[in-house]
Amino acid sequence: MANSHVAVLAFPFGSHGQAILAVTRRLATAAPSTVFSFLNTSQSNFSLLSSDLPPNIRVHDVSDGVPEGYVLSRNPQEAVELFLEAAPEIFRRELAVAETEVGRKVTCMLTDAFIWFAGDMAAEMKVSWVAFWTSGTRSLLISTQISSEKQSLSKETLGCISGMEKIRVKDTPEGVVFGNLDSVFSKMLHQMGLALPRATTVYMNSFEELDPTLTDNLRLKFKRYLSIGPLALLFSTSQRETPLHDPHGCLAWIKKRSTASVVYIAFGRVMTPPPGELVVVAQGLESSKVPFVWSLQEKNMVHLPKGFLDGTREQGMVVPWAPQVELLNHEAMGVFVSHGGWNSVLESVSAGVPMICRPIFGDHALNARSVEAVWEIGMTISSGVFTKDGFEESLDRVLVQDDGKKMKFNAKKLKELAQEAVSTEGSSFENFKGLLDEVMKV
């Protein structure tokens, strides 16, 4: 509708901003007469907005909540705490600016689920609140339900919750069921868990067929629950608005490799395994002789063993950035070695590629457990950390042994389900249309 004005409130940490911007781009393209005011910190916007946006997305920089002259400690939770303390007032002020600039009142609040206080703001403004959960179905269910049932939990598994029978308490994010329940992150999740059932709609990057039992559970929990993924397929390269970026020639390199032979390694942009583990990964790659692409930030390349880059120049490539989705979808891709972040898991599922997971923090262990024990499309690295022998054994298991063949078979089946979900009249295709209708309401 011509008069709709959607306020998008981003959570400016990790990959959250990137995820909600991707959805906002697609919505804005599908609804050119709707204005989307995108509110995010200047630092996060600077890292995200490298390409042209649809003209109906208006970008607004907001404060990060850090007082002028304040020096942050090395504790990453401090920045989150300062932002959350200041964010309600910061967002309120900028929303007034956005309404003045657009000349329209906000008609819908589209926010990261971590911006839990947006429910109160939407109620004050008498508009709908549409919340985006950026992780998986199991972490959403845990964050909104299990944290209130700690006393009734088994010491080992979450079998008391339908669809969670193979999940262990130790797989859950710290600060939800175990660990420091007074941390900033734990308190934020608790507040969010109480607030989300009030949302008009909760949506996420997944597809119903991946976890049908959990989909049913979440539909009962929320007023409206929509799975609109995998976003890597729904927002496919055929709809790409900017040229493919491959500055290091990864795609030209992989075209020369055999089917299902290449190891792709990437641990995300936020955290990386410690230097000692990077060393043994490098040693394992060199010893195994498998072809590889390793996406590793330049600041971490200093930790690689002396002579590794020269010694493996014909075997593989280490680059500061790689076109992950395109690499995973190449027929030469054999296995994805990852931290187990949700976006990476969904991109691997979308491509039908098995995984080796090395969880680092947050929902990584939960996602890795789903990969290994629920969907059986990969494995978690032995003992949870990289060792040279353990890494080589994992590569051999996935790429060569019968276990790996089963993982590949299961991964291909999930890929087919994912493709069906985003096809015309598929579940995610229809759910995205439902999301679009919701945000366009006046």
From Swiss-Prot:
GO molecular function: UDP-glucosyltransferase activity
Top-rank lineage group of the source organism: Eukaryota
Gene3D superfamilies recorded: Glycogen Phosphorylase B
Record keyword Transmembrane helix present: no
Amino acids binding UDP-alpha-D-glucose: 322-324, 339-347, 361-364
Family: Belongs to the UDP-glycosyltransferase family.
Name of the protein described by the UniProt record: UDP-glycosyltransferase 78D4
Organism: Arabidopsis thaliana
Lineage: Eukaryota, Viridiplantae, Streptophyta, Embryophyta, Tracheophyta
